[in-house]
Design a protein with these regions (language model features):
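A structural boundary/capping signal
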Residues: 1-188
């Protein structure tokens, strides 16, 4: 008999989504669902004594591997790429209307509430609410012109979010001197 087989990233994410889903009522509002996901990821609670947290050893995400979801799942320490991506992946598996949005050199989550309005969620800050005025204060280079142009603070489509993920992966390929980065660019 060999070593026990570890679940793939996909099955691990599916298992996490099932675990979160069991924590809130079937007919719960979107608000209850997103609050439950926040508590699950960033706790702490008795079932999750070691919640996911910001990686203070690499706060700027300079080590490319630290931007990868696989690293975040393994270490439970992430940054402004891996943390919102996990939140969005699990949220979408749960049917919660969440997506990625951007600020200068930063990603965070947008959640569409029961009232149809979008709300910011800052995964790097324990899943706290992060409305646009708060984000504007955090990023002095976030100009009204850039916001008006739609470059920042707009909910991204799935395709735009995929581009953000690919950008992180290309950095990983390049860091490991892999020719897969060139192949990936060609396929895009």
């Amino acid at each position: 008999a060999g070593a026990p087989r570890r679940p793939s990233g996909g099955s691990q994410l599916d298992a996490m989504a099932r675990e979160v889903r069991r924590l809130y009522p079937v007919n719960a509002s979107k608000q209850v669902a997103v609050e439950t996901l926040r508590a699950y990821l960033f706790g702490p609670d008795p079932q999750h004594p070691r919640p996911f947290q910001y990686d203070l050893d690499d706060p700027m995400g300079t080590k490319v591997d630290n931007k990868l979801l696989s690293t975040y799942l393994k270490t439970k320490k992430g940054n402004c790429v891996s943390m919102p991506l996990l939140f969005v992946i699990l949220g979408q598996k749960l049917g919660i209307p969440v997506t990625i949005t951007t600020a200068p050199q930063h990603l965070y989550v947008k959640f569409r509430g029961d009232n149809g309005l979008w709300f910011g969620v800052e995964a790097t800050n324990g899943g706290s609410w992060a409305e646009d005025p708060w984000q504007e204060k955090q990023f002095p280079t976030l100009t009204p012109r850039a916001i008006a142009s739609g470059i920042y603070m707009q909910p991204l489509t799935r395709k735009e979010t995929a581009t953000v993920i690919i950008d992180s992966l290309l950095g990983d390929y390049e860091a490991h001197k892999s020719n897969e980065a060139d192949e990936a660019r060609i396929r895009l």
